[in-house]
């Protein structure tokens, strides 16, 4: 068993518009408060479920006050809170109340048993990288964002191919005609990048993956770059080209706009139950080894 730091103040976060989330959040709050932890709620979550008796805090206030944030929802909820809390280094615990759950790895049915043990110090910790990106127009930055999974430059559904000029560390890589280009973290390699035939990167691997979306030339293949690379994607052709930062869209791109992407100085600490296995997650979520032996289960 791995013993880490015991926490004191615990922030609870849920996807506020999800039906049926109020009861498990209230149940978890009562469970951990009974064990002596101070419980606070993220403000939108508190408003949605009516968490009377617990302080309601903004993400910035959570970052300043809470020792850990417990997120009940899907991967999207976890990604959004991770971006907001990244500057504060607040650790995240993810409880799966969504569908896929690559990064919310605790089943909701187990949370009342597992979460208190983790808050008491029994957990495994890892750091996840983020990307920071900005849009540059006529030499001036006009937009800035963080991305946990990916930065995606793509065409709209009704326009032709986008034409992109891609440079890495100031050196020309290629011009590409395609439906778009994905720049993904190791965490994001199992998201949109995977559906576009990109490789899976272990989350502790220091790399950034570029994955073309339906390229005109089949020789345009995914490539994994060092994670200190500085990537520049210039719009040189096409119309109605968009850029998304973890599905947060900026839709007003113009010809010659450049999207600059690099690893963020921030990382997000993820906490897992003792015995967590990334490979077991892949096996379960991607349906590898559908009929494992009991020996395989013991090694998970």
UniProtKB/Swiss-Prot annotation:
Q: A biological process (GO) annotation for this entry?
A: NAD metabolic process
Q: Where does NAD(+) bind?
A: 75-76, 149-150, 177, 179, 190-195, 214, 248
The record's Gene Ontology cellular component field reads: cytoplasm
InterPro entries in alphabetical order:
ATP-NAD_kinase_N, ATP-NAD_kinase_PpnK-typ_C, NAD/diacylglycerol_kinase_sf, NADK
Gene3D superfamilies given for it? Probable inorganic polyphosphate/atp-NAD kinase, domain 1 (3.40.50.10330), Probable inorganic polyphosphate/atp-NAD kinase, domain 2 (2.60.200.30)
Needed cofactors, names only, are: a divalent metal cation
- Active site (record annotation): 75 (proton acceptor)
Which compartments does it reside in? Answer: Cytoplasm
Main subcellular location of this protein, as a coarse class: cytoplasm
GO molecular function, one example?
NAD binding
Reaction(s) catalysed (UniProt annotation)? NAD(+) + ATP = ADP + NADP(+) + H(+)
- List the keywords (alphabetical): ATP-binding, Cytoplasm, Kinase, NAD, NADP, Nucleotide-binding, Transferase
> Its Enzyme Commission number?
2.7.1.23
What NCBIfam families does the entry give?
PRK02155.1
Q: Which family does it belong to?
A: Belongs to the NAD kinase family.
Q: What does this protein do?
A: Involved in the regulation of the intracellular balance of NAD and NADP, and is a key enzyme in the biosynthesis of NADP. Catalyzes specifically the phosphorylation on 2'-hydroxyl of the adenosine moiety of NAD to yield NADP.
Family annotation (HAMAP family): NAD_kinase (MF_00361)
* Name this protein carries in UniProt: NAD kinase
Instruction: Supply the source organism for this entry.
Output: Burkholderia pseudomallei (strain 1710b)
């Amino acid at each position: 068993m791995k013993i880490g730091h015991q926490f004191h103040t615990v922030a609870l976060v849920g996807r506020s518009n999800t039906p049926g989330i109020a009861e498990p959040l209230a149940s978890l709050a009562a469970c951990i408060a009974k064990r002596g932890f101070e419980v606070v709620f993220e403000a939108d979550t508190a408003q949605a479920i009516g968490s009377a008796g617990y302080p309601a805090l903004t993400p910035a206030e959570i970052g300043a006050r809470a020792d850990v944030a417990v997120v009940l929802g899907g991967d999207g909820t976890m990604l959004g809170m991770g971006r907001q809390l990244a500057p504060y280094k607040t650790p995240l615990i993810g409880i799966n109340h969504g569908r896929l759950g690559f990064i919310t790895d605790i089943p909701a049915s187990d949370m009342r048993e597992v979460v208190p043990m983790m808050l008491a110090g029994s957990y495994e910790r890892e750091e996840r990288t983020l990307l920071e990106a900005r849009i540059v127009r006529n030499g001036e930055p006009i937009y800035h964002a963080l991305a946990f999974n990916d930065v995606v430059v793509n065409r709209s559904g009704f326009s032709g191919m986008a034409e992109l000029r891609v440079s890495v560390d100031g050196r020309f890589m290629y011009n590409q005609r395609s439906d778009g280009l994905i720049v993904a973290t190791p965490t994001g390699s199992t998201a949109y990048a995977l559906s576009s035939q990109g490789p899976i990167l272990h989350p502790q691997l220091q790399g950034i993956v570029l994955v073309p979306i339906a390229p005109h030339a089949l020789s345009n293949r995914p490539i994994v770059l060092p994670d200190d690379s500085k990537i520049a994607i210039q719009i040189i052709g096409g119309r109605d080209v968009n850029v998304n930062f973890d599905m947060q869209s900026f839709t007003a791109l113009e010809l010659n706009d450049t999207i600059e992407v690099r690893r963020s100085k921030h990382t997000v600490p993820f906490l897992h139950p003792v015995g967590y296995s990334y490979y077991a997650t892949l096996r379960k979520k991607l349906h590898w080894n559908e009929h494992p032996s009991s020996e395989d289960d013991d090694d998970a």
